[in-house]
Amino acid sequence: GVQLLSVLSNCPSLKLFVNTGSFAEYRLGVQQFDSAYLYSATKTAFRTFLNYYAGLYAFKYITAVPYTVYGGNPTVKRLMDYIIESLDAPAAIEMTGGEQILDFIHVDDISRFLIYVIQNHCSFCMLEKNGEDFHLGTGRGTTVREVAKIIESVSKRRCNINWGARAYRDRDTMYAVAPIAKNIELIQWKAQIELKVGIERYLNKQ
């Protein structure tokens, strides 16, 4: 990341940099950084370098904070993929208790946000605060178990999951729902794909 910023510092046309954060940077709420995992801690650490370069080379930046992403053609297996994999599986998939309340956002909404930023980059450059965070989610929380039930309802198949077979990690995020009011007030943007519709779309691509 720092190498990228160093290269971009030689680009005089750079006006806006879009950083990507993680909801796991806010284990105890969005008021302060408290990373749940090492990965999210590196995201928080990078912000210091980004702020330094932005001040030194006078460019604007924002941070997009995706919540629990699903859909598309994932390069890594995500939470929802494990649930889908359990459908009518002969052997039960071991998971935690599934009580986490998460905000599931379809990858198409993430893409739409990035396109929106590109199309409206001048407006983002005029934001009063440099380094503004935009939390990308629907603003609605759903437990992992509830997601499994929706998947069963949509697919007409049964999830074979052994709930509680795995322990929660010591700093697991148990509640992560995007605060979306700022998105609506500052940039007039919100996610469009409801969870059930997104799951239907995702299952149809399987």
Across the structure, where does each feature detected by a protein language model lie?
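Conserved C-terminal active-site "lid" loop/helix of NAD(P)H-dependent oxidoreductases
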Residues: V107, D133, A167-V197, R201
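Conserved Rossmann-fold NAD(P)-dependent oxidoreductase catalytic core, especially the SDR/UDP-sugar
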Residues: V2-L38
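A recurrent short beta-strand within the Rossmann-like NAD(P)-dependent oxidoreductase core
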Residues: T68-V69, I93-E94, L102, L114, ...
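C-terminal "lid/loop" region of Rossmann-like NAD(P)-dependent oxidoreductases
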Residues: N130-F134, T143-A148, K156-Y175
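NAD(P)-dependent short-chain dehydrogenase/reductase
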Residues: N51-L102, V107-I118, I150-E152
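Active-site beta-alpha turn of Rossmann-fold NAD(P)-dependent dehydrogenases/reductases
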Residues: V18-S22, V65-Y67, E99, G137
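Hydrophobic positions on the long internal alpha-helix
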Residues: G1-L8, F49-L50, F113, V117
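Active-site helix of classical SDR
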Residues: L38, T42-A45
